[in-house]
Amino acid sequence: MASETVSNHQEKALALLQADAEKILRLIKVQMDHLTMPQCPLYEEVLDTQMFGLSREVDFAVRLGLIAEEQGKVMLGELERELSALHEAFTNKQQ
């Protein structure tokens, strides 16, 4: 019974983290569509704040043993790659 509860908490934690990551990914995709992020410091600040918040959530979940450290790294790494692609796309547009 206890292992079912732990497993349920782990699944719920992962689902919540993935939902938060999806929200950030949508913000990135909107900016990719418009390539305006570097022109909008407020939007960049929002993305940075969201990424920082998610990294803290992931760290907390890892420390509680709700998700594996590798799962958290993969989740954050994917978002960082998308953010990097956004910056690269905007830079290429400017050239």
Swiss-Prot record:
Pfam families: DUF1507. InterPro entries: UPF0358, UPF0358_sf. SUPFAM superfamilies: EF2458-like. It comes from the Bacteria. HAMAP family: UPF0358. Belongs to the UPF0358 family. This is UPF0358 protein BA_4159/GBAA_4159/BAS3861.
